[in-house]
A protein has these predicted regions:
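Compositionally biased terminal segments of proteins
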Residues: 1-150
């Protein structure tokens, strides 16, 4: 399983400025603000990375835009608490599986099936929630292919 964090944000201009302040360039690779603005302007699937320089740990930031899959997944996000002060919301595993299936279809990287198998083993996947999206996105055969892999 890859060691990165996928984050979906509804990022307006004010939040963009706060995001840039929260990740100092001395500690993180942060793309130039103009790149983030370009990604914000894309109607679907705007994306950029944040990388912690010391550890190499990466966050893939996906912007909601008008993507119907994001609109579906946002209310289903799961809230996690770390200590008393930190709460984050994470995407449902079905959303992550759908995105990884899309990326696998586009590039056939072996990491995506491995990640999908790990998600199925660790968190499980609600196939009744997944099936309509698999059909809508034309991913049903890839899903079956990955499920049948050893």
């Amino acid at each position: 399983m890859t060691n990165d964090l996928d984050v979906v944000l509804n990022l307006d201009d004010r939040a963009r400025h706060a995001l840039l302040k929260a990740f100092p360039e001395a500690e993180f690779y942060v793309p130039p603000e103009s790149v983030i603005q370009t990604e914000q302007a894309r109607p679907q699937r705007g994306h950029f990375n944040l990388i912690h320089l010391e550890s190499g740990y990466k966050a893939d930031i996906y912007l909601t835009g008008s993507d119907p899959l994001h609109a579906w997944a946002m209310p289903l996000r799961r809230r996690l608490h770390w200590g008393d002060r930190l709460e984050i919301a994470v995407a449902p595993p079905e959303y992550v599986v759908l995105r990884k299936l899309e990326y696998y279809r586009e590039g056939h990287s072996a990491k995506h099936p491995a990640d999908i198998r790990a998600i199925r083993e660790v968190t499980g996947v609600d196939e009744s929630a997944l099936t309509p999206w698999l059909e809508r996105m034309g991913l049903s055969s890839l899903w079956q292919e990955i499920k049948s892999m050893p």
